[in-house]
Amino acid sequence: MDKIAVLIPCYNEEKTVEKVVSDFKRELPEAVIYVYDNNSTDRTAEIAEKCGAVVRHEYVQGKGNVIRRMFREINAECYIITDGDDTYPAECARKMSEAVLERNVDMVVGDRLSSTYFKENKRAFHNTGNRLVRKSINLLFHNDIKDIMTGYRAFSYEFAKTFPILSEGFEIETEMSIHAVDKNKIVRAHV
């Protein structure tokens, strides 16, 4: 069993995957870095492998399908999931893994929304949708998760192995948040 597994679902990320793998190797040299290629038509898998990542493939399209396979195939005390597009800073990974390994936190949620994310994101209604979903889930479950839809998280072994993934696509992030608060898992935002 790996102590820490960094899981990177990828679809056509040849421009950024090298940096993402290198950054996480630098911050967590003891971790095993896994890149799951989801039918990329570019050189994502080749570049990731050259950087030292363990490359595997999920041929059923969709991020939820990729994460389902990751959690099924990999055994680790701590899982860190990040996107292959270099959205999230690897510098936070150590604190996120320590929360899982040393403080028995089930899920650590990376927070895009406290930074410049809302200012930089120009997609119509995207920010409004994020706020609406976040407020609704936090109200229903009496919680205060800052970023329901982030792709940057850390998980315990128990969470990963008991999470019944139903989503096929990007709705997986919301499903993870709802599962955690519904099952009274210990959830923390990273520092």
How should each PLM-predicted stretch be described?
Residues D83-Y88:
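The conserved acidic donor/metal-binding loop of glycosyltransferases
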Residues D37-A45:
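A conserved acidic beta->alpha catalytic loop
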Residues Y79:
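Short aromatic/hydrophobic "clamp" motif used to bind/position activated sugar donors
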Residues N12-R26:
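Short, well-formed alpha-helical segments that are part of the catalytic scaffolds
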Residues K3-A5, V32, E175:
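Cell-envelope/extracellular polymer assembly enzymes that use nucleotide-activated donors
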Residues Y59-E73, A90-F170:
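Acceptor/aglycone-binding surface of glycosyltransferases and processive sugar-polymer synthases
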Residues F159-F163, G169-I186:
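A short, conserved alpha-helix in the catalytic core of glycosyltransferases
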Residues A189-V191:
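Conserved small/polar residues in nucleotide/adenosyl-binding loops
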